[in-house]
Amino acid sequence: MLNPSLPAIADLEDSFLPQNLPPVIDAHVHLFPDKLFTAVWQWFDTYGWPIRHKLGSEEILSFLFDRGVSHIIGLQYAHKSGVSRELNRYMASLCTRHDRLTGMATVYPGEPDAENILIEGFDMGLKGVKLHAHVQCFDMRSQSMKAIYRVCSDHGRPLVIHAGREPKSPAYLCDPHRICQSAFVREVLRDYPDLRVCVPHLGADEFDDYARMLEQFDNLWLDTTMMLADYLPCDTVPKLSDLRPDRIMFGTDFPNLPYAWDREIKRLAEMSLPQTLLSKLLHENALEFFKIHLDPAANLG
């Protein structure tokens, strides 16, 4: 549960990634136009937590690349009908300037011409779709969502969907515990077996259900966003070594964080995980999920 009393953490941060790690893809970075970022930060200041690095999109990319991150997955979401095309054009323009950025399209479920909006985004080079149920307040079983599933599946594009119940806020216009249930995600995975789905935050707070679904469905991935930080009041966060190793991706939620940019990657580096598992978590699984085809001459590290 989010509340305005969640604190900033004054932890120290370094100017580069920890040593001896495989190449790092951050699979969960938010990129918005400045005006929308300002609105997002105002919301967090009021209802969430203090954000340490309030940076614009270009500054975010420079910040992370300069500190050793090899590749970034740029995420966005449309908070209302009518803004999706503009957001998709914005993300596509960032991708044309940064070859180490893979951008996701977005759409407001149920808005007019939603399917064509996504197809246009794919034609601009965007590699998948990001939706946020808490903000967009959609029913995952609705016809408008089924249309999105079909478009993504038909075009081989993955769907990153904040479908977990947490972190929720009373400021949302809908109740995430009502509209976000692991059973709903299970239906999507079953009905659209060719659709690759990533649920962020390890599926918080239905960790056990999502861990079981990882074993049952080859089209489900999870990301670690904020779950390694020991910040949110979530109980029983699973150990990464207990989860299906080829279906977990590292992500941070940068820049919308109340702590050091490298808090989670440091903790990951201290877990003494096998190098093969680290490689999967930090880049191999993201390359597979997002179907990122790197130039053979490019150096991921």
Give the label of every model feature segment.
Residues 24-27, 73-75, 104-105, 130, ...:
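Active-site neighborhood of phospho(di)ester-bond hydrolases with catalytic His/Asp-centered motifs
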Residues 1-27, 37-38, 42-66, 70-71, ...:
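Mid-to-C-terminal alpha-helical segments outside catalytic/metal-binding sites
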Residues 2-6, 127-128, 141-249, 300:
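Catalytic pocket-lining loop regions of alpha/beta-barrel enzymes
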Residues 32-35, 79-82, 109-113, 136, ...:
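Active-site environment of divalent metal-dependent phosphoester hydrolases
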Residues 24-34, 160-164, 199:
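Histidine-centered catalytic micro-motifs
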Residues 28, 91, 121, 129, ...:
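Conserved, mostly hydrophobic/aromatic
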